[in-house]
UniProtKB/Swiss-Prot annotation:
Inhibited by pyrrolidine dione antibiotics moiramide B (CPD1) and CPD2. NCBIfam families: accA, AccA_sub, PRK05724.1. This is Acetyl-coenzyme A carboxylase carboxyl transferase subunit alpha. Its main location: cytoplasm. GO terms for molecular function: acetyl-CoA carboxylase activity; ATP binding; carboxyl- or carbamoyltransferase activity. Residues 38-292 form the CoA carboxyltransferase C-terminal domain. Pathway: Lipid metabolism; malonyl-CoA biosynthesis; malonyl-CoA from acetyl-CoA: step 1/1. GO terms for biological process: fatty acid biosynthetic process; malonyl-CoA biosynthetic process; response to antibiotic. The keyword Aminoacyl-tRNA synthetase does not apply.
Amino acid sequence: MAPRLEFEKPVIELQTKIAELKKFTQDSDMDLSAEIERLEDRLAKLQDDIYKNLKPWDRVQIARLADRPTTLDYIEHLFTDFFECHGDRAYGDDEAIVGGIAKFHGLPVTVIGHQRGKDTKENLVRNFGMPHPEGYRKALRLMKQADKFNRPIICFIDTKGAYPGRAAEERGQSEAIAKNLFEMAGLRVPVICIVIGEGGSGGALGLGVGNHLHMLENSTYSVISPEGAAALLWKDSSLAKKAAETMKITAPDLKELGIIDHMIKEVKGGAHHDVKLQASYMDETLKQSLKTLLKLSEEELVQQRYEKYKAIGKVSVEDQYIGVN
């Protein structure tokens, strides 16, 4: 098994050795159970040491993994009776955003999220999870429908950013995102947003104005990619690792800064190792959020959302700056 991430190399090597010993014991009469148990204990300790001390750049790499669970994966494990809706009723449908009606423990909800592909063919269909304007307009149509029928809205954020192509700009990409920000601020139903992978720039914000904002432990949320920031600040995109540490884009950092409400624990090694278990962690967070928000009146929901985002802009900086060489 080849390591997908450099910091996982010692883990993969030990897992491979354990697998080889288990196969050897099956093919021979030798009892190696004590040695296997010793290696498994060593593996557990090694995994704890690595995954409890991940650097920001490590988390960026995990968030970008092709087999990281997507919106549709979580919909399958968190909701029942999901009915997908298509189209923005103006131009067309956008496969980079999925959305529809579902039930969460019997409660009717509207679910919307960015959708990446897991291979080249699917990524071409999903445009690598980078929405066009019709994707954001489809999302807004579903949000207004939820507002009309008093259904809570749950948004999953997972995109490098909105698609920057010429056709998208011609169809009003910036206007579509801005309209979503404006309209989401005034929705009279609970809105819960969860960053499940990459939360990139305005493309993420287009689904990100909610009463509660949560992040998975190894997800990221930023105005620009580390590579882009490094190119702007230091004229060298190879300094992306340094930029990731400077930008404060990880869930632990953003929780400390008060940007997000809750960091959702991930299974050991990342959500891709056990999507069912990961969904159970998210299920508990969603239940707690809904329990809190459903107690609020329409006016209180709008006011709480307004105060939340108003507070994000309040910062105090004393003699701190990022040097540009």
